[in-house]
């Protein structure tokens, strides 16, 4: 079933794939990395003025990485604002996705966390560096194929 935003994107010739609706009835769309920046700008102009959250996950061992964006249209006098979930998949070998920092400033720390944990590079992000792990950390801890370093000391329980 195609949602309202998906129908609008089709009408305007914008390439995407509808993934249906989540359990709350929020429309979910898949956008290719090369199309994401231009569609993000269009969504902002269309009224999706709030990036509620951005996260990322490892789809499967050796598979794709996903960056997920939850956008909301906040309008005066509207009790139930329209929401959409956008998923952008990137190859594990060189995961690059355009940053939306310049569209929604709230993407700053969220994209940095996704970079730090999964190694997704957000092109044009002004400060893309580790935010949780030390700068010297090797690897991406939330990837399913991550092998934890063998240097942790077991602390005495006393």
From Swiss-Prot:
Entry membrane topology: Peripheral membrane protein
Source domain of life: Eukaryota
Keywords associated with the record: Chloroplast, Membrane, NAD, NADP, Plastid, Plastoquinone, Quinone, Thylakoid, Translocase, Transport
Cellular localization per UniProt: Plastid, Chloroplast thylakoid membrane
Pfam families documented for this protein: Complex1_30kDa
The EC number(s) this enzyme carries: 7.1.1.-
Annotated Gene Ontology cellular component terms: chloroplast thylakoid membrane
Entries under Gene3D superfamilies matching the protein: NADH:ubiquinone oxidoreductase, 30kDa subunit
Catalytic activity, reaction form: a plastoquinone + NADH + (n+1) H(+)(in) = a plastoquinol + NAD(+) + n H(+)(out); a plastoquinone + NADPH + (n+1) H(+)(in) = a plastoquinol + NADP(+) + n H(+)(out)
Gene Ontology terms describing biological process: photosynthesis, light reaction
InterPro entries: NADH_DH_suC, NADH_quin_OxRdtase_su_C/D-like, NADH_UbQ_OxRdtase_30kDa_su, NADH_UbQ_OxRdtase_CS
Coiled coil: none
Keyword Cell wall biogenesis/degradation: no
Principal cellular location given in the protein's record: plastid
MF GO annotations: NADH dehydrogenase (ubiquinone) activity; quinone binding
NCBIfam families: PRK12494.1
Physiological role: NDH shuttles electrons from NAD(P)H:plastoquinone, via FMN and iron-sulfur (Fe-S) centers, to quinones in the photosynthetic chain and possibly in a chloroplast respiratory chain. The immediate electron acceptor for the enzyme in this species is believed to be plastoquinone. Couples the redox reaction to proton translocation, and thus conserves the redox energy in a proton gradient.
Family: Belongs to the complex I 30 kDa subunit family.
Subunit comment: NDH is composed of at least 16 different subunits, 5 of which are encoded in the nucleus.
Name of the protein this chain belongs to: NAD(P)H-quinone oxidoreductase subunit J, chloroplastic
Organism classification: Eukaryota, Viridiplantae, Streptophyta, Embryophyta, Tracheophyta
Gene expressing this chain: ndhJ
């Amino acid at each position: 079933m195609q949602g309202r935003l998906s129908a609008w994107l089709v009408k305007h010739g914008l390439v995407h794939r509808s993934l249906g609706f989540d359990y709350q009835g929020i429309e979910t769309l898949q956008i290719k990395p090369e199309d994401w920046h231009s569609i993000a700008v269009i969504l902002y102009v269309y009224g999706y003025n709030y990036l509620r959250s951005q996260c990322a996950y490892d789809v499967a061992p050796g598979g794709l990485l996903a960056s997920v964006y939850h956008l909301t249209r906040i309008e005066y006098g509207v009790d139930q604002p329209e929401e959409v979930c956008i998923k952008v998949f990137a190859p594990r070998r060189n995961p690059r996705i355009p940053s939306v920092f310049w569209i929604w400033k709230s993407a700053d720390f969220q994209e940095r966390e996704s970079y730090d944990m999964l190694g997704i590079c957000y092109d044009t992000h002004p400060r893309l560096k580790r935010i949780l792990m030390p700068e010297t950390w090797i690897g991406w801890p939330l990837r399913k194929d991550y092998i934890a370093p063998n240097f942790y000391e077991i602390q005495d329980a006393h």
